[in-house]
């Protein structure tokens, strides 16, 4: 019955933490608010009942929205052309590289097959480059997390004749603004190659700078990050690419329009159903609002960094002592001194009602945190309180006040069925496990399962088919 279906969906909802409960601090994911007003078009049949291959004269309004959104994205990125076809950020990377290849072939440079990728670039870059048929060359970073300029110059010169492009993320995945970004672009262009800017961290650029101004040739955007469409359980993503004037002729076409060059989606405008959300976000925010959002995102990240630097420590800071829109929290020393790992800290955060941050990426043994502009001062302060309380729990282990093999960290998370069960054999109280601070008492989110073996779970998928709801 519909009633059963409704209750089934609600049961699933209760198992899943979301922004409706607390901040999701996943670094490099930009888990910002998906405002209800932006989502309104999803309930309108004029948008949702439109077939991707509908005749053009029956989709004039939708085409107008697509054209207007494309103009907005060109203005934001400082580029001359846009394709909305790619269905994810990684698909955008792949598409951008295909565009670069087509351009190079058009000027008799099709032999160029190497992509230079700094160690601080976004994680999908090497895979996208290889998928697009290129060979990757890694460029080192210095001790401050910046691209090592000497190594960059050496690698660029060494591969000068075969270099197709540099893929670089700005701000970098280390959470800092590369001070030499313009010079980096100049070095690559001097080799006859193109600059691909990964837009994963565009939330720290909008309104303050843009890839075109910096000197890039192509970038992709993540509408599900910077531009507020939902991540939605791993999708749906939209990863449009924006390109400089000389690359516009090589943007993806579509067989429907008689030009399948660089086509990457079966639908001419990709996941077009998502576009009204982003269009609504941009129109409601306006230029001033988008710029303020960028400033607030950077401010929030630096506020967290300032409050956590004396306990955990921040791995990388920019030349001015600040981070970008995210930070990497140092946990390696904690593990050396106490045996408590970044994994233990991440799982303990679940007991406090928070989604775990990004774990051991891009630096092993660390946590990457991105608060976005959407979080209030109260939420930031509560998260700081939680992290400092966990720090105290770590110190209890370090000082011998808590058993190193049986404590709230190594046993986290603590689901309800475990806390209320008849047998409780831990050295600490049920209250310490489940209700460590007052804010948790007021807004408890119960995790569904106790600790699982991450590696075993990743390597051995066990699927279950349910006969009924």
Each model region followed by its residue ranges:
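Mobile "lid/hinge" segments at catalytic clefts and subdomain interfaces of large enzymes
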Residues: 236-305, 309
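Non-catalytic terminal extensions of PLP-dependent enzymes
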Residues: 1-81, 98, 118, 149, ...
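Conserved PLP-enzyme active-site core in the AAT-like
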Residues: 61-64, 91-260, 340
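Short glycine-centered, acidic/aromatic-flanked micro-motifs in structured strand/loop junctions
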Residues: 86, 141, 168-171, 329-331, ...
